[in-house]
Amino acid sequence: MNIQDVKNYLPHRYPFLLIDRVLELEVGKSIVALKNVTFNEPQFIGHFPDQPIMPGVMIVEALAQATGILAFKAEVSKPTNGQIYMLVGIDKVRFKRMVEPGDQLRLEVGIVTVKRGIWKFKCKATVDSQTITSAELMCTQKATD
């Protein structure tokens, strides 16, 4: 999936759209997506000016966005008005290395379970085959009205 396809499944836009491309998608099972980290991103103005590092919460958000694409593809649907797909839980988060401008973040997500509308995912972010972040994320779709 290219960026235009990604935008059909995520409501996020600049500067908060954190998926650049989907490399692999096994519907109902897993997704591999990319985030190209560039110095031009606004978080690097203050995190940190002399040594820019991607904030850990942004890495987790990129993983959460990958879960959204995977969940919508599994349900053969797209986001609709009056509905929002949201992060409802984060477990076992580990930050092992820093992410800097110029890195390409590989986001790997697999479905663990789906129960009563709550999706649980096992997630990993890597740079150059080295694990950067791992986490278990829980998400659901809710009405906004």
From Swiss-Prot:
Transmembrane portions of the chain: none
EC annotation from Swiss-Prot or TrEMBL: 4.2.1.59
Principal location listed in the UniProt entry: cytoplasm
Annotated GO MF terms: (3R)-hydroxyacyl-[acyl-carrier-protein] dehydratase activity
SUPFAM superfamilies: Thioesterase/thiol ester dehydrase-isomerase
Keywords: Cytoplasm, Lipid A biosynthesis, Lipid biosynthesis, Lipid metabolism, Lyase
InterPro entries, per database record: FabA_FabZ, FabZ, HotDog_dom_sf
Entry annotation: catalytic residues: H47
Keyword Lipid biosynthesis (UniProt): yes
GO biological process: fatty acid biosynthetic process; lipid A biosynthetic process
GO CC annotation: cytoplasm; membrane
Gene3D superfamilies xref list: Hotdog Thioesterase (3.10.129.10)
Localization: Cytoplasm
Catalytic activity: a (3R)-hydroxyacyl-[ACP] = a (2E)-enoyl-[ACP] + H2O
Function summary: Involved in unsaturated fatty acids biosynthesis. Catalyzes the dehydration of short chain beta-hydroxyacyl-ACPs and long chain saturated and unsaturated beta-hydroxyacyl-ACPs.
Family stated for the protein in its record: Belongs to the thioester dehydratase family. FabZ subfamily.
NCBIfam families (alphabetical): fabZ (TIGR01750), PRK00006.1 (NF000582)
Protein name: 3-hydroxyacyl-[acyl-carrier-protein] dehydratase FabZ
Species this protein is from: Vesicomyosocius okutanii subsp. Calyptogena okutanii (strain HA)
